[in-house]
């Protein structure tokens, strides 16, 4: 299958009438140090699904990326150093002059230094607002290539040290103390509003927003949850108003599993991606202003809550002149503490840059559709590709729905960003389990849960055989969730295995001794809350991120990528989870998370960042000059 350059990807995207990518793509980067003589610079090779760690580029764009996440505007670029500093010590000079190296070697080293310096400058120019859009595309095409398997190869020097991060913690634009705790926000302060939630993804992506919507509704607000038609019954049963968004989560999930991310593995894959994204993007505006499809009651949104995969949400908010608040279950704001979950970068100096690279590659696939929406539907001017006009930085508030006991808020995230806690939806209290399931659970020891939710499994029969054999070898009982993947087709029934369809995790997991799953944020949260040691088998997207966090916290083994799933690894993982120390660590973490109320935290964060009460909610919301930034296209701060 042919490789695809960013320029070719952009060309196909622009000429196609279809749409781009989904929430849980993966871009990974392999970083290697290349030897090339005494003074040669290291080179970062980004391959195997886009990651990135150009230390040099991080040094050159640190001011810009800090501005984006902290709300400060600084467009200055530091000088990119890829060669030894001129101010080296006299002893270093003496040693250098006394070394008698062949002229050929010296020439080779100098050439490599020159090449790496050029690469660094090229990478830095991608984020320079003085460079034209066409030039930026050529630069990106020069240093990045989408490989046949949907991965990206990217080369830049890696010898620079990132600049220290300075976060402005002054007063926010809405008159709220920048570091004011969300616990101090008055929930009764905001008058009733009509709020629309624009949510794209699987059932696990939608569920926490159902919990938040119900809480907002309790405070007197009208909440419309706009998501895929597949989840209409789920939303209506929760007592919420539903509006259909485009896109089919089954198709999106199947594409992501096949391609290991949002980058297409070949030209034939691009239309699949784009058809889905076009349907999503063009359904956002109607969701904000069209009458209720069932009752016909009129609706006009006063505010938007969205997740990043609802590409186009910020543009709709701009057109309607209403505030928007982005919530997500995985990091989407640049930080130097860990890389973008859709990337893999080992060196900390590349963590921040990984967010820029992931955004730029997503933007390649959707910019024509977004601009078409802006011109034809929103009556706005087009967005410049990879615009560096950060201005005062994005002021879009972000709320991250995970426990700070699992992943604390990074120190370089500014006042517009909150870590609110996991957002649980109570499904257990109204659940009536089948008598057969209750009898099986009571007939023996607590089982181990194994399931991969709504993700399609490539070889379900083989995976089922591995699961059953691993349970038998470790002498454990197991519950297999068949899900969308078709697990559980046993050749013959097993007394120690129980097969089930959907069961609320908050009911089932407290009755299990350990869990094995794909690593979705919601499933991970439910397992940890139930004190269950956890093994994560990531398929794509943010799942490896959660697998690594679980392992780092000591409550589970190293994640097992689905392509490496084997009897030996699953057996080792089960034995790891059965260790008393691991169980104790899981209980300690669950105890720390016990008093968290992520739903209340999300509601308070939403209220905290709304315009001041002195400003009418229907008044235009001032937007920073950086609205045309490519980062803004994804709702990134």
Curated annotation (Swiss-Prot):
Catalysed conversion reaction: a sterol + UDP-alpha-D-glucose = a sterol 3-beta-D-glucoside + UDP + H(+)
Composition-biased stretches (Basic and acidic residues): 103-112
The keyword Disulfide bond is annotated on this UniProt entry: no
Documented EC number(s): 2.4.1.173
EC class name: transferase
Gene Ontology terms: biological process: carbohydrate metabolic process; lipid glycosylation; seed development; sterol biosynthetic process; sterol metabolic process
Lineage: superkingdom: Eukaryota
Disrupted gene: phenotype observed: Reduced growth rates.
Pfam families on file: EryCIII-like_C (PF06722), Glyco_transf_28 (PF03033)
GO molecular function (one): sterol 3-beta-glucosyltransferase activity
Region (Disordered): 1-29, 66-112
Biased composition (Polar residues): 67-79
Swiss-Prot/TrEMBL keywords: Glycosyltransferase, Lipid biosynthesis, Lipid metabolism, Steroid biosynthesis, Steroid metabolism, Sterol biosynthesis, Sterol metabolism, Transferase
Free-text tissue specificity from the UniProt record: Expressed in roots, cauline leaf epidermal cells, stomata, stamen, pollen and around the base of siliques.
UniProt xrefs under Gene3D superfamilies: Glycogen Phosphorylase B
Ranges of Low complexity composition bias in the record: 13-24
Listed GO CC annotations: cytosol; plasma membrane
Function: Involved in the biosynthesis of sterol glucosides. Catalyzes the synthesis of steryl glycosides (SGs) and acyl steryl glycosides (ASGs) which are the most abundant sterol derivatives in higher plants. Can act on several sterols like sitosterol, campesterol and stigmasterol. Both UGT80A2 and UGT80B1 are required for the normal production of SGs and ASGs in seeds.
UniProt record similarity statement: Belongs to the glycosyltransferase 28 family.
This protein's name: Sterol 3-beta-glucosyltransferase UGT80A2
Annotated organism of origin: Arabidopsis thaliana (Mouse-ear cress)
């Amino acid at each position: 299958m042919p490789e695809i350059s960013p320029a070719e990807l952009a060309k196909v995207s622009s000429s196609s009438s279809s749409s781009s990518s989904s929430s849980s793509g993966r871009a990974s980067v392999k970083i290697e140090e290349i030897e090339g003589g005494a003074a040669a610079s290291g080179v970062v090779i980004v391959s195997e699904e886009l990651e990135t760690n150009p230390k040099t580029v991080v040094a050159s764009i640190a001011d810009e990326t800090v501005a984006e996440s902290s709300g400060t505007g600084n467009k200055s670029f530091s000088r990119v150093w890829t060669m030894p500093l001129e101010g080296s010590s006299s002893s270093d000079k003496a040693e250098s002059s006394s070394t008698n190296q062949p002229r050929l070697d010296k020439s080779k080293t100098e050439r490599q230094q020159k090449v790496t310096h050029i690469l660094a400058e090229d990478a830095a120019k991608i984020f320079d607002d003085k460079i034209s859009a066409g030039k930026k595309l050529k630069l990106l095409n020069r240093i990045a290539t989408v490989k046949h398997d949907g991965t990206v190869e990217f080369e830049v020097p890696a010898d620079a040290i990132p600049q220290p991060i300075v976060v402005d913690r002054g007063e926010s634009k809405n008159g709220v103390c920048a570091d004011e705790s969300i616990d101090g926000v008055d929930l009764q302060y905001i008058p009733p509003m009509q709020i629309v939630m624009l949510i794209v993804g699987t059932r696990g992506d939608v569920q926490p927003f159902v919990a938040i919507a119900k809480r907002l509704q309790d405070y007197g607000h009208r909440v419309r949850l706009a998501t895929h038609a597949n989840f209409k019954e789920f939303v209506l049963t929760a007592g919420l108003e539903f509006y259909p968004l485009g896109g089919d989560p089954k198709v999106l999930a199947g594409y992501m599993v096949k391609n290991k991310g949002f980058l297409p593995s070949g030209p034939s894959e691009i239309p699949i991606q784009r058809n889905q994204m076009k349907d999503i993007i063009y359904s956002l505006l109607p969701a904000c202003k069209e009458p209720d499809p069932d009752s016909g009651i009129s609706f006009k949104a006063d505010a938007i809550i969205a997740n990043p995969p609802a590409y186009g949400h910020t543009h709709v908010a701009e057109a309607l002149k209403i505030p928007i608040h982005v919530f997500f279950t995985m990091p989407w704001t640049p930080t130097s503490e860990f890389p973008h979950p859709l990337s893999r970068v080992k060196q900390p100096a590349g963590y921040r840059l990984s967010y820029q690279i992931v955004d730029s590659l997503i933007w390649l696939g959707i910019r024509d559709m977004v601009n078409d929406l802006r011109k034809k539907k929103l009556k706005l001017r087009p967005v410049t590709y990879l615009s560096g006009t950060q201005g005062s930085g994005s002021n879009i508030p972000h709320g991250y729905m995970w426990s700070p006991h699992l992943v604390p808020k990074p120190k370089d995230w500014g006042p517009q960003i909150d870590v609110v806690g996991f957002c649980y939806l109570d499904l257990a209290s109204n659940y009536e389990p089948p008598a057969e399931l209750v009898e099986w659970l009571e007939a023996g020891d607590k089982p181990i849960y194994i399931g991969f939710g709504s993700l399609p499994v490539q070889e379900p029969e083989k995976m089922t055989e591995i699961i059953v054999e691993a349970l038998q070898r470790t002498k454990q009982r197991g519950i297999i969730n068949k899900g969308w993947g078709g697990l559980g087709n046993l050749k013959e029934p097993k007394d120690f295995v129980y097969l089930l369809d959907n069961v609320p995790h908050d009911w089932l997991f407290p009755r299990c001794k350990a869990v094995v799953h794909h690593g979705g944020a919601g499933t991970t949260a439910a397992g940890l809350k139930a004190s269950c040691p956890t093994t994560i088998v990531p398929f794509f997207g943010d799942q490896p991120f959660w697998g690594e966090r679980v392992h780092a916290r000591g409550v589970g083994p190293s994640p097992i990528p689905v392509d490496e799933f084997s009897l030996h690894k699953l057996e080792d993982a089960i034995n790891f989870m059965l260790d008393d120390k691991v169980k104790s660590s899981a209980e300690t973490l669950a105890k720390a998370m016990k008093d968290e109320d992520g739903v209340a935290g999300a509601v308070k964060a939403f209220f905290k960042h709304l315009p001041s009460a002195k400003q009418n909610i229907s008044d235009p919301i001032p937007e920073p000059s950086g609205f045309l930034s490519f980062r803004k296209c994804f709702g990134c701060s």
